[in-house]
């Protein structure tokens, strides 16, 4: 029998042969278990698309300009928006890479190996990678980064992903303002993150975890030069294809290409992000006038305005990108779960999709698990029910409803449109919502602290990753302040189950908790789209809104 890196891979082959899983599911699962993409594609009788790219065919030189917000970046390990990561990722890189088909590959890693029980992950670092300033990338660099994001004093959202298999919570011996015990966290053992040799790192986990390679591509999980100690700006050292030469918050980011980059490309001489502000019309005008060559994102309204421009190509991809109207359960109006249930019953999802997205989406189910996620469990759908929602409010002590502020931002316009339709529908059950549309810079400061807020969440290939980031107790990105011990326990259990069918049985319980007790109203899953000038070559829209400028070129 052919030797595979994990004993479960032959089972996956049998399941694919029997039609129990699709070829794409096989590719996703087998590569997580350490099978190379080339080998996985060979098993399914396909050619790895990345092997077809020919650098010789790409035009060389020129400057590419993409319209995107340029936010303040305090520390790459704290990056909390895709736009911030796009600024950083041209300079600093990741150990892994999840492509637009949700297949995860080694990147700064040569390969990884995982034990049969999913508790030991051995990471083999490429030996040909050098930092821009000349030194080689080593295991010491990787260990420093992994330990840094595991430190609660840093505040990285990666900590929420590592909690449950590398990091454990403990009682800090103090009380918060409400008299509850304060929790902190730490690596579960001294050798949890272990240097094996100069190019090998081992993760010794206390619990099984299937999604480690995808966690290593979570957008704050950059590999930074320890000498920079988390600082980022012009001249920051990185292993990536570009050097940042200028960065002005709210205006632009400018780069020049490295000539000694270890990987593919870059083909451009220079690259630039142009901040076009909060007005969505500015993006349309910038494309029309050729002020920029493309946008990082364009919603359905913008696409409708630009699709007939003769120099423009439109790109679309189905995603697990969404938006949630999330409530703080520790606020008086939202403490009773019946209020949160009523808010969910108040909405007409199809109407929101047609009005806010011009139809470019599919209904969601208030649990942040998409049908495209391999562990999704189908639960009974529930329609809009105004009378039931009103009764729930009355039973919770609000027979006449209540009034509350909802924070959102004006750009992208689909978010504000969604807020307006939600407010109209909440009003039908007696809940008057005052929309507070803040300038983006102000919104970014309060997105986790506002008691009721509309927040967009990006695409992730596994639901367990999103749930860990967004709803695990005390996670840095737990903007809803949700805390449910049963939810946390089930999530940790799901993260260690290899077979997605078995995982979906646990996921059904998690989804039911979210629909019954959870903190969100989730109307839809969104089709992601953008535009590029037809002279831009090599662009392929990533479902996570990521920009990889070293892959792009400008046709002369």
Name what the model sees in each region.
Residues 530-556:
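Long beta-strand-rich cores associated with HINT superfamily self-processing modules
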Residues 66, 134, 287, 297, ...:
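Periplasmic binding protein-like
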Residues 362-395, 410-415:
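Structural transition elements
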Residues 1-25, 48-50:
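N-terminal secretory signal peptides
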Residues 67-116, 147, 235-238:
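N-terminal lobe/hinge region of extracytoplasmic solute-binding protein
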Residues 99-103, 173-194, 198-200, 204-272, ...:
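Gly/Pro-rich hinge or "lid" segments in bacterial periplasmic/extracellular proteins
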Residues 191-194, 428-443, 466-534, 556:
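Extracytoplasmic/peripheral linker and loop segments enriched in polar/acidic and small residues
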């Amino acid at each position: 029998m052919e030797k595979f890196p994990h004993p479960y891979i032959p089972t996956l082959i049998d399941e694919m042969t029997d039609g129990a899983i699709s070829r794409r599911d096989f590719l996703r699962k087998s590569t997580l278990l350490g099978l190379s993409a080339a080998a996985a594609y060979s098993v399914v009788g396909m050619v790895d698309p990345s092997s077809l790219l020919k650098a010789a065919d790409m035009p060389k030189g020129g400057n590419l300009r993409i319209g995107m917000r340029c936010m303040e970046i305090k520390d790459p390990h704290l990056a909390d928006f895709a736009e911030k990561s796009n600024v950083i990722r041209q300079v600093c890189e990741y150990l892994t890479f999840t492509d637009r088909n949700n297949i995860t590959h080694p990147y700064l890693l040569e390969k990884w190996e995982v034990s049969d029980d999913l508790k030991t992950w051995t990471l083999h670092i490429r030996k040909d990678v050098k930092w821009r300033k000349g030194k080689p990338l080593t295991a010491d660099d990787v260990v420093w980064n992994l330990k840094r994001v595991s430190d609660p004093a840093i505040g990285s959202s990666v900590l929420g992903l590592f909690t449950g298999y590398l990091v454990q919570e403990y009682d800090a011996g103090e009380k918060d303002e409400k008299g509850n015990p304060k929790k902190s966290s730490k690596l579960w053992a001294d050798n949890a993150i272990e240097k094996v040799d100069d190019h090998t790192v081992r993760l010794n986990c206390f619990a099984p975890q299937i999604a480690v390679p995808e966690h290593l591509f979570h957008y704050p999980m950059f590999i930074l030069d320890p000498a920079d100690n988390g600082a980022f700006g012009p001249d920051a050292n990185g292993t990536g294809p570009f050097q940042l030469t200028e960065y002005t918050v709210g205006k632009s980011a400018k780069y020049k290409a490295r000539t000694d980059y270890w990987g593919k490309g870059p083909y451009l001489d220079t690259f630039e992000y142009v901040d076009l502000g909060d007005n969505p019309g500015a993006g349309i005008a910038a494309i029309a006038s050729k002020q920029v060559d493309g946008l990082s994102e364009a919603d359905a309204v913008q696409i409708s305005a630009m699709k007939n421009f003769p120099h423009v190509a439109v790109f679309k991809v189905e995603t697990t990108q969404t938006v949630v109207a999330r409530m703080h359960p520790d606020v008086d109006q939202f403490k009773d779960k019946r209020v949160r249930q009523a808010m969910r019953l108040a909405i007409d999802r199809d109407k929101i999709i047609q009005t806010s997205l011009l139809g470019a989406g599919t209904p969601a189910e208030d649990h942040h698990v998409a049908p495209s996620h391999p562990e999704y469990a189908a639960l009974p759908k529930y329609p809009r029910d105004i009378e039931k929602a009103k009764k729930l409010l009355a039973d919770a002590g609000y027979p006449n409803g209540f009034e509350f502020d909802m924070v959102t931002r004006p750009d992208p316009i689909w978010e504000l449109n969604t807020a307006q339709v939600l407010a109209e529908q909440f009003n039908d059950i007696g809940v008057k919502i005052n929309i507070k549309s803040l300038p983006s810079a102000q919104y970014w400061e309060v997105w986790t602290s506002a008691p009721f807020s509309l927040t967009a969440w990006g695409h992730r290939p596994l639901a367990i990753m999103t749930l860990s980031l967004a709803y695990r107790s005390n996670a840095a990105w737990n903007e809803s302040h949700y805390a449910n011990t049963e939810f946390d326990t089930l999530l940790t259990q799901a993260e260690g189950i290899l077979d997605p069918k078995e995982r979906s049985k646990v996921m059904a319980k998690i989804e039911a908790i979210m629909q019954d007790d959870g903190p969100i109203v989730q109307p839809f899953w969104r089709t992601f789209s953008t535009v590029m000038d037809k002279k831009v070559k090599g662009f392929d829209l990533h479902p996570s809104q990521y920009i990889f400028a070293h892959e792009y070129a400008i046709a002369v």
